[in-house]
Amino acid sequence: MVVGVDLLATSPVEGAKLIIGDATEDSTITQVEEFLEGRMLNVVISDISPSLTGRYDTDQAISLELSTTVLDVAVGVLQPGGTFVTKTFQGTGIEGLVDAAKDRFSNVQRYAPTASRNASSETYLICRNKLPRARKGANGRTAMEQVSDHLKNIGIVTNRNDPEEEVDTLVGLRKLSRRE
């Protein structure tokens, strides 16, 4: 069984179910789950990528969020022992994504494609052997919650809902106090 999700319509592929939608939207994930009817997948491959802005830090942050979202989706539709592959950009927060993946798969590796330009930060995360349940390091959190916690721990602002948090100036995503 092959299920494809894309924002844009593509030519039909014999034997495949193609869903036109945003893989980060609940309605699209619901369509996938309804099609699966409780069946689980062996492999999830994602080449999700942001619409590039030309600002590396912004593109990398959006790529991290997209890859983490797809990791959470994959964990929900993969059978134990399954494999997840995603493309992301190397940079701030990537270790949080790798750690979240390691809590859900027994083998996690990063690869930079040899066909990619030397200056490219494109990397693939290959996650093999999905565990029946997440390791204790996940502490019941989603991958997105783990990555958000990782970003907070390294001083990156991920949300501004905490009225107690004193943030004087925001530059990109890193919070700076007036003293810096």
Regions found by a protein language model. Give the residues of each.
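C-terminal substrate-binding/active-site "lid" region of AdoMet-derived donor-dependent transferases
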Residues: 11-19, 44, 56-136
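Glutamate identity and glutamate-enriched acidic tracts
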Residues: 14, 25, 33-37, 65, ...
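Acidic-enriched, low-complexity/disordered segments with a strong bias for Aspartate over Glutamate
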Residues: 6, 22, 26, 47, ...
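SAM/dcSAM-binding transferase cores
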Residues: 118-180
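S-adenosyl-L-methionine
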Residues: 3-53
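Short C-terminal domain-edge/linker segments immediately following a structured domain
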Residues: 32-39, 47-51, 74-79, 115-119, ...
